[in-house]
Structures are given as C-alpha cells and as structure tokens.
Amino acid sequence: MTHVEVVATIAPQLSIEETLIQKINHRIDAIDVLELRIDQIENVTVDQVAEMITKLKVMQDSFKLLVTYRTKLQGGYGQFINDLYLNLISDLANINGIDMIDIEWQADIDIEKHQRIIKHLQQYNKEVVISHHNFESTPPLDELQFIFFKMQKFNPEYVKLAVMPHNKNDVLNLLQAMSTFSDTMDCKVVGISMSKLGLISRTAQGVFGGALTYGCIGEPQAPGQIDVTDLKAQVTLY
C-alpha cells in the first residue's frame, strides 16, 4: 500500500477571495496538495495565474500547489487547444510558488512537443502530472494499461487516468490497471473511477498503489468528488 496525498481542487472565477481562503484554512489539516484550476477563466493569462499564486503563497508551507488547465476535450472548460494550450503550460514554469503542473495526454499529441515541454517544466523544478480523462466511459482493461504505459514514457513524476464507470466491472478494471502499473513502473500513479459508483477509487487509492486522491472544498469540481475533510478521514482508514 502506498502513501496517499489528498488534493483539494479549487476553481476561482477571477481571483482568490477572502472567503475561499477561509474555507481552505478551515480544512488545512486535510490538504496535502492544493489544485488551482484555471480553465474556468476565459482567456486566462500567466499574469492572472501568478497573482492568484501570490495570494495562496501565504499558506503554501502547509501544502504543495498544483496548477491545472483542463481543456473541453477532457471534460474541462478550457478553450485553448494545440499550441495555445501548450504555450500556456510551458509559461507556467516561470511562476514561483507552483510545485506541480498538469499536462494532458491524448493519443494524437505531438510527442516531441510534449517531451520538450515536460523537460522544460522539470528544469524549473516543477513536478509533472501527465493526465488523461474520459468522461464518457471506461475503456477495456488492456486499453487502460496501454494508456498508463504510453503516458509514463514521457518520464513525468505522476501519471493520472480518470474514467467514467457504467458498472462495477469498470471500477474493478481501473483499479486493476492502476495496481499493475504501480507494481511495475517507477513513476507515481493516480487512477480515478469517477461518479459515486467509483468512489472507492478515491477513498482506497493507496490500497491499489495510487499516490494522489482528489477531493473538493465545498462544490465538487469533478463527478464523485467529496469534501477533502471527509476524504482525508476515509483515506487514513486504510
């Protein structure tokens, strides 16, 4: 069983308000990583992100900061695609205070560009979470394993795969794929079976070799997320 860090996802509209800081402080003991989603901000700029990071730095000794721009293609709000998306991700490396950066994987990506950007982020001491999301279904077990394998070839610190289950076998396949990957590969793995049906993948993440589990502060930012306070309590049971 692996040690699991609890990620709290926030998605402020334009800035970090005092009420949000209070909500974070109220849950500070449950948070290992704070994920700042920025895809909900239309035409977001690096300067806007830097300003938000500055406000969060006050509490940063308590947790690591992960920045994520989730595109519409993978279930987010982000309109940036191709070079616009990759340029934003690359430019995030210049912001002090960011510890981790999410970069999406698709089967048709430009491999050389992705490799170059991931190395660039790592040169600036940012941990890379390479991720893939399927909000429609859960692929067969062999395809899940293949996606994990393809993502780890970029040598990230974390590989993350989130899929939507339609039955309990979908959940079991995701957990098996994650467990097998954890036993055979060096980088850390995250596997999420979304919605209430897949909740066990969030609460028992460490049992199957996972390193991160994602929760929310108040309103869920993804199907199946629960409040980080409850999530932390569940994770520590295992």
Curated annotation (Swiss-Prot):
Organism: Staphylococcus aureus (strain JH9)
Signal peptide: none
Function of the protein: Involved in the third step of the chorismate pathway, which leads to the biosynthesis of aromatic amino acids. Catalyzes the cis-dehydration of 3-dehydroquinate (DHQ) and introduces the first double bond of the aromatic ring to yield 3-dehydroshikimate.
Annotated active site: 133, 160
Subunit structure: Homodimer.
GO MF term set: 3-dehydroquinate dehydratase activity
Binding site for 3-dehydroquinate: 35-37, 70, 202, 225
The protein's name in its UniProt record: 3-dehydroquinate dehydratase
Coiled-coil zones: none
GO biological process: 3,4-dihydroxybenzoate biosynthetic process; amino acid biosynthetic process; aromatic amino acid family biosynthetic process; chorismate biosynthetic process
PANTHER family the record matches: 3-DEHYDROQUINATE DEHYDRATASE (PTHR43699:SF1)
EC number, UniProt record: 4.2.1.10
Similarity comment text for this entry: Belongs to the type-I 3-dehydroquinase family.
Enzymatic reactions: 3-dehydroquinate = 3-dehydroshikimate + H2O
Sorted UniProt keywords: Amino-acid biosynthesis, Aromatic amino acid biosynthesis, Lyase, Schiff base
InterPro entries noted in UniProt: Aldolase_TIM, DHquinase_I, Type-I_3-dehydroquinase
